[in-house]
Amino acid sequence: NRLSFGVQDLDEEVQKTIHRIQPFELTQNVIKIARDAGIHSVNTDLIYGLPLQTRESFKRTLEKMLTLNTDRFAVFNYAHVPWLMKTMRKFDESTFPKPETKLEMLKDTIDFFTSNGYKMVGMDHFPKPEDELFKAIEKGELHRNFQGYTTKGGADLIGIGVTSIGNGVDYYAQNFKDLNEWEEAIDKGNLPVFKGYRLSDDEILRQYVIMELMSNFSLNIKKVEEE
């Protein structure tokens, strides 16, 4: 009943640099298809801090995305991890926005969405006032997992496709990154998981505390002790 689309940025030069060509019209069309199919809540993800981005170019992206009237926006800080992502090794690091520019871009984003009818939730999400995500923070029921904010605290996340990550109370698991390996596992009737991590009791506690602070910016010590 809800879909999330990754957009990142609409600037053509930025898209070429990050090897992710995704015209605005394509995003516009799939969102219309989702609406026509009865999907009641649509989220779009944007990223600031990408190569060749400027405050001005990202403002243009925000203005254009606003016309899509999506129910939520998630605006993440770009994480440059070339030791994990081979494609990032091709990026010219001199083209990244400076840290102070990224802070200005974040401020621009907050000002833009909050002045256009959206509410800021947590560190990087912007839902409409009637969205259940905003209602959750008013009730103190907002949660966060490694993908962002959610109203479904404690629910297992099941990764299905290539590279997808799943997690439960005490584990993380990632599927094969190679399509052939993923298909081979499926054909054999196996889960296409190639690595995982089991959390210790101490790590589970630390995770709960961190996520609670990131979600509600406060900590109920009694509740932590009960958990």
Describe the residue ranges of each PLM region.
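C-terminal scaffold of the Radical SAM
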Residues: 1-227
